[in-house]
Structures are given as C-alpha cells and as structure tokens.
C-alpha cells in the first residue's frame, strides 16, 4: 500500500484484563514494560498510521497513557475484540477520517512490524473487504490441532490466498500445503461497520470463529502469506518466552 494511503489507516489494539488462562495479561511485565505497551511499540514501529489502544480497565488505561500512547476506555461487556475496536473507532474517529482499520491483538508483544504491514497488502485489491495473514504449516501436530485455525483458500499468487473458509478441522483434504490463519485483520471501514452490525452466524457459532461471519455475509477476505506465526501470549510459559525474545533483541 502506498504511503499516500497511510493517512487513512488507524491501528487499534484491544486489551482485555479478564483473560481466562493468564488473568491481567495486558499488564504483565516484559522487559520493564507492560505487555500492552510492548504491543503498541511494535505497532508504532510498523509506521502505518495512528495507533490507539482500546482498554476496559483504568489500570491499563493509566499504564498505556503513562507510556505516551493514545488510549480509549471501552465497555467491559464486549463479546469480541471486533466489537471493542468498533466502539473505540466511533470514539476516536467519529468524523470517519480513517478508511482502513488494523486490528492487532493485544497479546502479540514480539510481532515483527513487517508482519503488521503485510496485512494491508490484500487491500490493494479494491474488491477485498478484509485483509489478514497466514503461514504454511510445517509441524505435523499442528495440522490436526483444533486450536490451530486453518484457512482454505484459492492461491492468487505465490504469497496470497483468497479465503473460502476457516476451520479447526484438518483441511483441505488431499495433497498440498495446509495454512495456519493468523488473527490480525485490516478492515475497510465500511466492512468493519457491516461486520459488527451482523449477528453471529451459523458457522461462526459452530466453529467458534468470528471471521466466518464475514464469509457467510458474502464479504471477501484475502490472506497474505508470511514466514512465521507471531507468538501469542496465552500462558505463563508463553510470557516467559516473550521475555526471552525481547530481552535478546535489546542486548
């Protein structure tokens, strides 16, 4: 995406304190900074546009603000990160200047800024409503693991897929690569507005995959192929790994 279009990009990072596996994880210390601040730093390093953190608790609000990042308070009862970022969008950009909304999960403190930028590339095609990311699965266990979401897509080029379905099953059948979906999204504003206006869809509820709502509504999702899956911090072991990675980079 050209630099001339970056003025219309808004990066929103949802942060939720009530994690079941790692409670309070937005404030977990990683190399002297709260994890949510580390994520905001990676987003700023991507240099694609304005960065705002959407929080649901005053302690997180204060920590993000103290680090010098823009932050907005949102309701605690949102059912999904998409709902939270939409509330944040209406608060921080009510005049509609942002035309593309990038949703970076608040538990990706080690994400490569280039990976963030890659999510924008599918939107170079005006027919695409939502851009996302994927990588080829090279671990045999991951191919059958339900927590690894697979993307079934038609190859558009060597580094992009047109998404036809997302599933926790091992698919598609037969010979050929399987792809791991990475849950980082770049929405056209109109697509996000439509997405949150729709109720949960049949397949979304069956697979517990929010992105299926968009596909069932006829929206187009394309996925850029990247080299690796960013580390999502969901457990104490993940947190220790993130600390090691960022500590090594700072030395």
UniProtKB/Swiss-Prot annotation:
SUPFAM superfamilies, A to Z: Nucleotide-diphospho-sugar transferases (SSF53448)
Pathway membership: Nucleotide-sugar biosynthesis; CMP-3-deoxy-D-manno-octulosonate biosynthesis; CMP-3-deoxy-D-manno-octulosonate from 3-deoxy-D-manno-octulosonate and CTP: step 1/1; Bacterial outer membrane biogenesis; lipopolysaccharide biosynthesis
EC number(s) on file: 2.7.7.38
The keyword Cytoplasm appears for this protein: yes
GO cellular component: cytosol
Cellular compartments annotated: Cytoplasm
Catalysis performed (reactions): 3-deoxy-alpha-D-manno-oct-2-ulosonate + CTP = CMP-3-deoxy-beta-D-manno-octulosonate + diphosphate
Keywords, sorted A to Z: Cytoplasm, Lipopolysaccharide biosynthesis, Nucleotidyltransferase, Transferase
Family annotation (InterPro entries): Cytidylyl_trans (IPR003329), KdsB (IPR004528), Nucleotide-diphossugar_trans (IPR029044)
Main location (coarse class): cytoplasm
Alphabetized GO MF terms: 3-deoxy-manno-octulosonate cytidylyltransferase activity
Domain of life: Bacteria
PANTHER family in alphabetical order: 3-DEOXY-MANNO-OCTULOSONATE CYTIDYLYLTRANSFERASE, 3-DEOXY-MANNO-OCTULOSONATE CYTIDYLYLTRANSFERASE, MITOCHONDRIAL
Function: Activates KDO (a required 8-carbon sugar) for incorporation into bacterial lipopolysaccharide in Gram-negative bacteria.
Protein name, as recorded: 3-deoxy-manno-octulosonate cytidylyltransferase
Source organism of this protein record: Rhizobium johnstonii (strain DSM 114642 / LMG 32736 / 3841) (Rhizobium leguminosarum bv. viciae)
């Amino acid at each position: 995406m050209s630099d001339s279009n970056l003025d219309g990009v808004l990066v929103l990072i949802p942060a939720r304190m009530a994690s079941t596996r790692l409670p309070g994880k937005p404030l977990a210390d990683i190399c002297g900074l709260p994890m949510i601040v580390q994520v905001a730093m990676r987003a700023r390093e991507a240099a694609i546009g304005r960065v705002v953190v959407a929080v649901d608790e005053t302690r997180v609000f204060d920590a993000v603000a103290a680090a010098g990042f823009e932050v907005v308070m949102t309701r605690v009862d949102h059912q999904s990160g998409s709902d939270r970022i939409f509330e944040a969008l209406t608060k921080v950009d009510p005049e509609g200047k942002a035309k593309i909304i990038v949703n970076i999960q608040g538990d990706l403190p080690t994400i490569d800024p280039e990976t963030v930028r890659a999510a924008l590339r599918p939107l170079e095609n005006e027919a695409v409503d939502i851009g996302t990311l994927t990588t080829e699965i090279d671990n045999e266990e991951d191919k059958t693991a339900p927590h690894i979401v697979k993307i079934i897509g038609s190859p558009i080029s060597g580094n992009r897929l047109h998404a036809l379905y997302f599933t926790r099953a091992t698919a598609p059948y037969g010979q050929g690569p399987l792809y791991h979906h990475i849950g980082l999204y770049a929405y056209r504003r109109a697509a996000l507005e439509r997405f949150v206006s729709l109720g949960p869809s049949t397949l979304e509820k069956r697979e517990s995959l929010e992105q299926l709502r968009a596909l069932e509504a006829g929206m187009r999702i394309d996925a850029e192929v990247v080299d690796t899956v960013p580390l999502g911090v969901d457990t104490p072991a993940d947190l220790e790994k993130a600390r090691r990675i960022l500590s090594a980079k700072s030395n």
